[in-house]
Amino acid sequence: MQVVDPHLHFWALGQGNQPWLEHPAANLLGDYTPMARDFGPQTLLEERGDIELLGLVHVEADAVNPIAETQWLTGELAEHDKLNWALVVGVDLSQPDAQVQLEKQCALSERVRGVR
């Protein structure tokens, strides 16, 4: 089967930007324990099974420091250019510096395709 994943998240728990996964607890949305691990492009490739991944769109998952997330992602994904990846980055459009933030995001990667 061929797939384009239009919405996924990568993270490295050691970065401290996903505190909800550091000590997951069952709640109304379920048990996050299976997600409480690093998940990056290499893990995706190892766990995809028979799925032919034609492309992916990483959607911002670090609302606290989206610029740092984009810097990290471009480094992680640089080694996986064949994945045909794109980014939806975080920019708070209600802030006066939104244009500056968006310009910073776009300067970090030519693969920015959207804003969240």
Where does each model-flagged region fall?
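Helix-coil boundary/capping segments in enzymes
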Residues: 1-116
